[in-house]
A protein has these predicted regions:
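Cys-dependent protein tyrosine phosphatase-like superfamily
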Residues: 1-194, 208-321
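Residues at the beta-strand->loop junction immediately N-terminal to the Walker
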Residues: 197
Length: 321
């Protein structure tokens, strides 16, 4: 499913057998309304309000099975990389439920329309992975949601100079340990929908999302593909306000983030692909480090985060369908 224009959506599926198409404002087919019957061409176009986020349901006319789909990324006016982790294939032939697990970039410049759209998600928890300095520079405009952050210095990400993915991504495994434990604790309490974010919504959030999807049994190739979507869906101009480093003395992140929206009006740099020159996704450096240090992702989840077989079974019961 994709938005081909602000007011136009297209649904696509591979099976040519007839399906009924239903639409609802929540991921619950029982409450959805029929919009098209016995569509057999594998595609269906329909109008959509610019900022509504409907859910659609394909009901197979042969066996009445239902597949839920939605837009992966929220169509925000001034947000960045805010997307749903639903719909991915997971353990035991199931899929990740839509509308419960979100990932995002920072949200300091949301419009009022954006705030209303995010409020409609019914978030029960936000896990903010940003440093203390980043949160000072760009406070979130999302209100009314329990907000969890763990203070640390931005310098911890680049303690010896320029960030390199080969060393920086493995280092983030330890850096994010407290936040990851809080994320899984919230999910095991069924405190969802939950949104996890950092500044760009790609590096720290990419690692956290990869670990969460791994716990749900999502295949590695799908996890990496989701990670790489950030290049397409980021809008750096909305991740930070215009910053004058002189206004933030002692803030070690101010100079770096000043380029997001330079005070002198220069263009905001475009996102760059999250891979090395030879095509290696940066995320794989973190995943390889986990497997080297703990033997496997399951070993890491159990011994480091306390998410053993029983906890993974509960997560899959609650967040898969």
């Amino acid at each position: 499913m994709e938005r081909t224009a602000q007011d136009q959506l297209v649904l696509r599926w591979q099976d040519s057998a007839p399906v009924d198409v239903l639409e609802g404002d929540a991921p619950d087919a029982a409450k959805a309304k029929l919009v098209a019957r016995a569509v057999a061409r594998g595609t269906y176009e329909l109008p959509a309000p610019a900022h509504a986020r409907p859910y659609f349901f394909h009901k197979d006319n042969r066996d009445q099975t239902v597949v839920t789909v939605a837009e992966r990324v929220l169509s925000l006016e001034q947000g960045s990389n805010f997307r749903d982790l639903g719909g991915y294939p997971a353990a035991n032939g199931k899929t990740v439920k839509w509308g419960l697990l979100y990932r995002s970039g920072a949200t300091p410049l949301l419009s009022e329309s954006d705030r209303a759209e995010i409020a409609s998600l019914g978030l029960q928890q936000m896990i903010n992975l940003r440093s203390s300095e980043e949160r000072q520079l760009a406070p979130s405009r999302i209100t009314g949601v329990p907000y969890t952050a763990v203070g640390y210095s931005f310098g911890a990400i680049m303690p010896k100079g320029a960030f390199t993915p080969e060393t920086g991504y493995p280092a983030m495994i330890d850096l994010l340990d407290p936040q990851l434990k809080l994320l899984f604790a919230a999910l095991l309490r069924r405190q969802a929908p939950v949104a996890t974010n950092c500044s760009a919504g790609q590096d720290r959030t990419g690692i956290a999302s990869a670990i969460l999807l791994s716990a749900l049994g999502v295949p590695r190739a799908v996890i990496v593909k989701d990670y790489l979507l950030s290049t397409q869906y980021r809008h750096p101009e909305y991740e930070m306000p215009a910053i004058d480093p002189a206004q933030f003395p002692g803030n070690s992140a101010a100079a770096m983030f000043a380029h997001y929206r330079p005070a002198d009006g220069k263009p905001v740099p475009s996102p760059t692909p999250l891979m090395t020159a030879d095509g290696t996704p940066f995320l794989t450096f973190a995943l390889a480090d986990i497997e080297h240090r703990w033997g496997s992702m399951d070993g890491y989840l159990e011994r480091q985060l306390g998410v053993g077989p029983a906890e993974r079974a509960q997560l899959r019961k609650d967040y898969l369908e």
